[in-house]
Amino acid sequence: FIRNLTLRQEGNTLVLFQFVEKHGKILHDMINDKDSERKVFFVYGGTDTDQRENIRRITEGENDAIIVASYGTFSTGINIKNLHNIIFASPTKSRIRNLQSIGRGLRRNDTKVSCNLYDIGDDMSWKAKKNYTLHHMVERIKIYNEEDFSYKLIKVDL
């Protein structure tokens, strides 16, 4: 689902994930294997600073690049004005991390007037087991309401 959502987006897309091996690398490979025409970058803690800067520079000049990056490396401290879409591919409830991550897409440039955020929340409910993924989504919705963000919830049956 996340791969297909990413590939359907127009413009540059940032996909943020939590765990490098369990999420990020697999997602990067799935996206890259499906579309070899687009530039698809993978950024995590092991990506050196010069390479990150090169990816940032390339993305500023592109209109169809995909960056699959860990929250730790791209949720704060990176300035790419030419981002059109952000996808939260892993659940988190941190207010600061969420707002900083959204801020990646709010940088203005001459051609961009908006940025789309896709915040994915899975309902992994089963019997009486606590569903942290859904709980984190509810916490993020509270943040969006407090910040007066415009959003809509879409249920997707898989």
PLM region spans:
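Conserved strand-helix element at the start of the C-terminal RecA-like helicase core
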Residues: 1-30, 144
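Amphipathic alpha-helical protein-protein interaction surfaces
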Residues: 11, 36, 79-82
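Short coil/turn segments at beta-strand junctions that form active-site/ligand-binding loops
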Residues: 11-12, 19, 38-39, 63-65
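Long, largely alpha-helical accessory region at the distal end of helicase-like NTP-driven motors
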Residues: 12, 149-158
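Conserved RecA-like helicase motor-core motifs
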Residues: 14, 28, 32-54
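Conserved beta-strand scaffold positions in the cores of enzyme catalytic domains, especially
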Residues: 40-42, 117, 151-153
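Conserved RecA-like P-loop NTPase helicase motor core
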Residues: 44-147
